[in-house]
């Protein structure tokens, strides 16, 4: 099967956890779109190693289908981890380029969530705070400072709290 191995390990864990409890979805491609799973994924403790996906707090994950050379989104309320451990030190070994790229992913989440038609006052608050934190901390995270990593860990988490309530735009479907 094709799993999102080029992405966050949390995304991979979410897909595997859902399939373990819902074996009828053994072909991961059957999870595309709004997945009609019946059982919650296996108990999961998410420990993000990047500051970008917010997989630890959202009902979304992206699968890369390497055979068809495309990615697709899965939306499933049964895949949210029970516990999230946000430890900026887990991101310390990321190369500068990956840190910048995942930071831009978090920024894209915040902008798309803020501009979506479903946005409202509470989600605007999350997204605007995420944008502010990213503007303040992305450069430091790329330079691997503790303050920068901590700020980006919080920023991507806050962006995830926002977009998990309103969805994203077309950028994330490309």
Residue spans for each PLM region:
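Short, small-residue-biased leader/transition segments that mark boundaries at the very start
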Residues: 1-8
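Short beta-strand segments
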Residues: 6, 45-48, 85-87, 108
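Glycine-rich, small/polar surface segments that engage phosphate groups of diverse ligands
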Residues: 7, 15-16, 156
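Short, well-ordered, mixed-charge alpha-helical segments that flank or form enzyme active sites
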Residues: 10-12, 37, 41, 51-57, ...
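A glycine- and small-aliphatic-rich helix-loop capping segment at beta-alpha/alpha-beta transitions
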Residues: 15-32, 59-69
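Short, acidic/small-residue loops that bind anionic groups at enzyme active sites
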Residues: 22-49, 78
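Carboxylate- and glycine-rich phosphate/diphosphate-binding segment that chelates Mg2+/Mn2+
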Residues: 60-166
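C-terminal catalytic subdomain
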Residues: 166-174
